[in-house]
Regions:
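Beta/alpha (TIM)-barrel catalytic core signal, keyed to glycine-rich beta->alpha loops juxtaposed to Asp/Glu
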Residues: 1-149, 154, 158
Length: 159
């Protein structure tokens, strides 16, 4: 016979929680875990795109400058009014509990029963430090409730 599927790979972040509504229950039932990628929502959850900023050498900054339909559509999916507003709120939650939004987003991603591990990416050592700081973090019920409140108020920031 063929090997059984063990995991699937989907985009999953504080700004893209569709997996919870669309596939999580089936994955639990079938014993298939999620290997999420883009836990920082393409870097948006770091706050680097807040207030209309387009940092040099950032992927979506290049996409906006190229102004080509495919790249522009992707950039607008990740960076829009809803995603930057939710990011600001998540950053405030992170600050309240003494961590960066990068650490918060990574910790949140790995704290789901259907997640096997989380695919992360970094271009600089200090980015990796913030990501790896989430390894031993377990977010409190209060923090998770605050996160869920933002997600209810700003439903599906990435569409």
């Amino acid at each position: 016979g063929t090997a059984r599927y063990q995991t699937i790979q989907n985009n999953f972040s504080l700004n893209n929680r569709r997996f919870e509504d669309e596939l999580a229950q089936t994955c639990r039932k079938e014993g298939v875990s999620l290997l999420p990628y883009s836990p920082l929502g393409g870097g948006v959850l770091s706050g680097k795109y807040n207030d209309g900023q387009l940092p040099d050498n950032a992927r979506f900054s290049r996409y906006f400058k190229l102004n080509e339909k495919r790249q522009l559509t992707m950039a607008q999916r990740f960076i829009n009014e809803k995603s930057t507003e939710s990011t600001k709120r998540f950053m405030a939650i992170a600050a309240d509990i003494g961590m960066t939004s990068v650490t918060l987003a990574t910790a949140w991603s790995k704290q789901h029963d259907f997640v096997a591990s989380t695919i992360v990416g970094a271009t600089r050592p200090e980015q990796l430090d913030e990501i790896l700081a989430a390894a031993d973090v377990t977010l409190s019920a209060e923090t998770l409730n605050r996160i869920n409140e933002v997600s209810r108020e700003i439903l599906y920031p990435m569409g």
